[in-house]
Amino acid sequence: MTRRIGILTSGGDCPGLNAAIRGVARAAYAMFDAEIVGIQDGYRGLIEGEWREMRRDEFSGILTLGGTILGTSRQPFRTMRVIGEDNVDKVKSMKKNYERMKLDCLVTLGGNGTHKTANLLSEEGLNVVSLPKTIDNDIWLTDVTFGFHTAVDIATDVIDRLHTTAASHGRTMVVEIMGNKAGWLTLYAGLAGGADIILLPEIPYDIDRVCEAVARRANAGKAFSILAVAEGAMDREEAAMKKKQRAEARAAMPYASVSHRIAAQIEQKIGVETRVVVPGHIQRGGSPSAYDRVLSTRFGVHAAQLIRDGVYGMAVGMHGHDVVHNPLREVAGKTKFVPQDHQIVQAARQMGICMGD
């Protein structure tokens, strides 16, 4: 029996998307009679009916390719049940186009928002399997997401390269690393890159403690310091605020970001020349690492196995060294934060790295 599989990629792009698409398709072709439908630009394509029949040869040569051959877009979950000015019922449209494409199932590749919408569609009666994609590594019930380790490699390389210029000029360097809610990327890259100070959203910092750490290194004859700062890092005052109040305070501050504020405060408080480096979207671009190619492929193959067995409403993930699946309803709407007592946090502290608190 032929199974028609719709595939979409949603949210921010990251390395490994094409490898995962390839994994789903090639495993499906090998295990059963499959037809693959490529849905363009994420959930927007499912809403607007933008899709195309995929040929087998389109899945060749994409294992190492960054980005996504299907395109992507951000369609916030909070708007999915909201009928806007265009008078479009998004959920109704997605269900209608699912039927119009004659799909047997839908495979979604994305982060937390993607999983929430995937769960919504599952609850609406569609057959859905979701794969965990994000450089933030913050999806619930999976030890790792594809794209994360490639981003760690990139951010680590940035920190590595800053060591030489920081040492040459005797400067303190603040590296702003992606991660608005969860600090996994900053934690891993900071430790791998030999950062002296690591600031995460989960551990509110005290700027005086940060300055003390920089001054202590200077007094010990260290000509420079490296700070790995998550874009969502916050000080203790901000941490005590409500979410809306904190957002308003951030919008009103005279700095481009929290990293720029920290750099200015270091210069003002202890007179140490400080520069900010923001690698930005470089962290989510380019070819996936060997690790992410293998991980993405394994996730894709597992999705095909679930489709073969008729098991839907599932989110694929990793537990230890094993690829597993969990009910979407248990994954959607939850975020995997860095625990303050995590072994890697403890290791950083025991090495004398300042965590800002």
Regions found by a protein language model. Give the residues of each.
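Alpha-helix capping and helix-loop boundary segments enriched in small/acidic/polar residues
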Residues: 12-15, 85, 112, 142-150, ...
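Accessory alpha-helical/coil subdomains and C-terminal extensions
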Residues: 97, 108-110, 118-120, 127, ...
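Flexible loop/turn connectors
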Residues: 299-308
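Glycine/threonine-rich beta-strand-loop-alpha-helix active-site module
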Residues: 25-56, 124-161
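A cross-family phosphate/adenosyl-ligand binding-site feature
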Residues: 1-10, 20-104, 113, 232-240, ...
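Short glycine/serine/threonine-rich phosphate/pyrophosphate-binding segments
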Residues: 13-24, 46-47, 88-92, 103-119, ...
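Short beta-strand segments
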Residues: 8-9, 39-40, 71-72, 108-110, ...
